[in-house]
C-alpha cells in the first residue's frame, strides 16, 4: 500500500491545527494509517501545534526548507504520493513547473486563496502566470463545487472531486433553534478576519447606507498578526459612520467558545471578499440561523444554492425585512443534511484519500 504524505506547506497555525486535529481525532480512527498518519508541516514553532499522538509529524521551520524536503522525497521515489492541503508555497509550485515533482505524485486540496489572483503588482502577476501553469500539473484536485468549476475553466483535463475543509463544528449545535430578537437594532458580523480581502471599509459604508447608523457591527480582526496599521484604518473609517458603542473591533484571537457566543448573537454576516474563503465562519453562522451577504464573485454561492440555502448578494437591495425573510428560510432548512457540515464531510475525505493514495480508481 502506498504511503500518502500530507503536506501543510505554509505556516498557518490556525488552519493547520484544524487539519491536524481532524486527522488525529477522526480520520486516524477510520482509515488505514498509510493514508492518514504522515505529515510534513511548515511550522516555526512546532511545539505550539499541540500534541497529535495518532500522527507522525515532520516539521520544518519555514516554507523553503519544507519544499526542499518534499522535492528530495519526490525525486528519490517517483511512486511517492503527496496530498497538498492548500498550497501557499511558491517553491513547490515551481518544482511542479520544472518537473522536479511529477503530476502523478500530487493531489491538491484547494483552500480558495491559493487559486485566486488578487494582487496587482507586476511581480505577483508574473508569479500568477507561472503558478497557473503549475496548477494544471497535478494529478487530481479537490475543492468546493464553486472552486472546482473555477479551476476546470482553466484545467479541464485534470480530474476534480468535491471536498470540503474539515470545519471545526459541534454537530450537537446543528439541530438547535436560535430565536432572533426582533426588537432593537440588528447585529452584523463584518468579515472573517483582519485580512484586507474582506474589504472592511467598503463593507462598513455599504452597511451604513443600507441599514443606517443604529446597527451594531462586529469586526473580528485578530488574524493575521502585525496588522495594527490596517486595523486602525478600519476603526477610523468605522467611527466616521457608527458610534463607538455600535462598533466593536476584535483585535485579539477569540477563543472558540467565545466566538460561538458572538456569532449566536448576530442577525447577519457581511462577507464581500471576491473569492472563496471563510467557510468555517459561514458554517457556524448557518448553524445559528444567521444569513449572510456574499459577493457574486465568491463561487461558494454555488455550494450554498446546491444545499438549498438562502443567498444574499452584495450589490442587491437589502433592508431588515429581506434579512428577516432570509432568517426564516434558513430556519426551515434541514441543517443535518448540509453536505459541508460535520460529520457529513467525513465520507468525502475517506473517498479523497483513497483516490490520492491510488487505492481507488
From Swiss-Prot:
By sequence similarity, the record places it as follows: Belongs to the glycosyltransferase 56 family.
Annotated localization: Cell inner membrane
Q: Which NCBIfam families match?
A: PRK02797.1-2
Pfam families assigned? Glyco_transf_56 (PF07429)
Q: Does this entry carry the keyword Cell inner membrane?
A: yes
- Which GO MF terms does the UniProt record name? 4-acetamido-4,6-dideoxy-D-galactose transferase activity; fucosyltransferase activity
| Membrane protein topology class | Peripheral membrane protein
Enzyme Commission no? 2.4.1.325
Instruction: Report the principal subcellular site.
Output: membrane
The broad enzyme category this protein falls into is transferase
Reaction catalysis annotation: beta-D-ManNAcA-(1->4)-alpha-D-GlcNAc-di-trans,octa-cis-undecaprenyl diphosphate + dTDP-4-acetamido-4,6-dideoxy-alpha-D-galactose = alpha-D-FucNAc4-(1->4)-beta-D-ManNAcA-(1->4)-D-GlcNAc-undecaprenyl diphosphate + dTDP + H(+)
Which gene holds the coding sequence for this protein? Answer: wecF
Q: Which GO terms describe its cellular component?
A: plasma membrane
What organism does the UniProt record list as the source? Serratia proteamaculans (strain 568)
Q: Which GO terms describe its biological process?
A: enterobacterial common antigen biosynthetic process; fucosylation
* Protein's name according to its UniProt entry: TDP-N-acetylfucosamine:lipid II N-acetylfucosaminyltransferase
Q: Which domain of life is it from?
A: Bacteria
Q: Which UniProt keywords apply?
A: Cell inner membrane, Cell membrane, Glycosyltransferase, Membrane, Transferase
Q: In which pathway does it act?
A: Bacterial outer membrane biogenesis; enterobacterial common antigen biosynthesis
Purpose: Catalyzes the synthesis of Und-PP-GlcNAc-ManNAcA-Fuc4NAc (Lipid III), the third lipid-linked intermediate involved in ECA synthesis.
